[in-house]
């Protein structure tokens, strides 16, 4: 059991400025995991024991003992019932999916000596087999199959994969394209003239009587609204033309004489007003009869 002095030393070591925890894969397997499996207590408890599948990956950094960009946990292997002993890696909002086959980890001093296996998994939001891939990655380290030590505990390293600028640009382009499709696909708000209903005779026959009466009433109201509007526009155009003609002339009528009297012209049937016929209608010619002619001679 660790003494109070050991705990103080451990706390002081971890909180020292500049302290970073970046173990190699060989150190994780041959030192931390192996000592945890055999039950050997370490002086510095830098890796905590946690069932990470009860939490989503974005919650794990706050549950780790140390780490800034990488977080480490001892995790119990939870077997899924009736599936050949495959571990259950499902969380509340997603699941961890393995990518590729396991990779063998060897020591630097003896490349032929296998000290463990590494499995890489990626977190997907949703439910299997469908889901949305995220940038959360996990490296699961376990002891080799030929090891006689218990294998109910694994060591997991959680981190976020660095996203390149090209991938970010592709995501932004896809998001923009999806928004444009939604804008094009969404129906535009109809105007007042677009809402006018014109039903075919066949549709009117198939339409119930109350509904048909309602539609005809709506069409009649729409026509009554449109006709006065057209008459108003016509009157405005006539008034505008009148104003233009008035403003275009330079003649001004005297005050009180805005309206000229009508020009008096002789009627078409009044031939006495013509100068030629007035000469023929002289009094002398009126007395010019056959009797007067004989008396004249």
UniProtKB/Swiss-Prot annotation:
Pfam families: NAM
GO cellular component: nucleus
Localization: Nucleus
BP GO annotations: regulation of DNA-templated transcription
GO molecular function, one term: DNA binding
Keyword match Cytoplasm: no
Function, in words: Involved in response to abiotic stresses and promotes cell death and hypersensitive-like responses. May act downstream of NRP-A and NRP-B in the endoplasmic reticulum (ER) stress and osmotic stress response that mediates cell death.
Name of the featured protein: NAC domain-containing protein 6
Recorded name of the encoding gene: NAC6
